[in-house]
Amino acid sequence: MSYHYQMNNNNTDFFDSANYIPQMQMHHGYQDFYASDSTSSMPSSGTTQQALQQTENGIIQGQNGSDHGVAFHFRAYGGWRQHDWNSTSSWSIGNQLEMENGTLTMSHGATNDGNIRNNQQMMTSNHITTDSFRQIPPSGLCYMDPTPSLRLPKKEPLPVQRPMARSTPKPFRCQTCGKAFSQAANLTAHKRIHTGEKPFMCPVCNRPFSQSSSLVTHRRTHTGERPYPCAQCEKAFTDSSTLTKHLRTHTGHKPYVCSICMMKFTQSGNLHRHMKTHK
């Protein structure tokens, strides 16, 4: 919704208490202001200097004596804000207006109205701005760029919060050895170790396997497929676990340590064979 307020030619007071809220909404929202008064439409800088006159008490008046319409027009476009209003019917601008090259400059030099409290100044240096008026259409519509201090601050992106590491519950437990699993399918495959069941048969050599993944790896020995090559040498392997073991020969990593003599090994099978020497 837009608020359009026009200047009156009958010297109507724009700053009575009934119009205070719509006026402040218009200031903060940067709505369009239509100046129907010929003294406040400001078609050019030359005519503006002729149309505006500053009286001795600081109130700017037009040539026809309409002070409130012109004062309201420049309060709206000058970026002025109210801090203390003791009188809504009598308000003095108390500032000088200068027009240079189409730019309206407001300089804080005159005195404020006597009804304004001394300990709360109506204007400060931060309120005095210089606003460049763009080309004014024939209808008298004025435009003003938003004051930088009134623009909404940019919201900083929220930091990405990674979920906390949680231990996966393992509700499926083997009744033979007590080993627990997170999925029932893993427990079923594990039970075949105890029962010796091997339902997966190789169609080439009829070799049975307890898990389907073991059958897939075995069939690569017949096809010659080796999808896991080593980046350090020219060797390739049929499964990823064999490649991991091979890479330790290049890096020298030996994660398996004997608890008796502290001897290290690259593979767990080598550690098991070594432990038999201590018995």
Swiss-Prot record:
Q: What is this protein called?
A: Transcription factor che-1
Name the job this protein performs: Transcription factor essential for the identity of ASE chemosensory neurons. Acts by activating expression of genes that are specific for ASE chemosensory neurons, such as seven-transmembrane receptors or guanylate cyclase. Also required to control the left/right asymmetry in ASE chemosensory neurons by regulating expression of genes such as cog-1 and ceh-36.
Q: Name one GO molecular function term.
A: zinc ion binding
Q: Entry's InterPro entries?
A: Znf_C2H2_sf, Znf_C2H2_type
SMART domains in the cross-refs: ZnF_C2H2
Keyword list, A-Z: Activator, Chemotaxis, DNA-binding, Metal-binding, Nucleus, Repeat, Transcription, Transcription regulation, Zinc, Zinc-finger
PROSITE patterns to which the protein is assigned, alphabetical? ZINC_FINGER_C2H2_1, ZINC_FINGER_C2H2_2
Where is the protein localized? Nucleus
**Where mainly found?**
nucleus
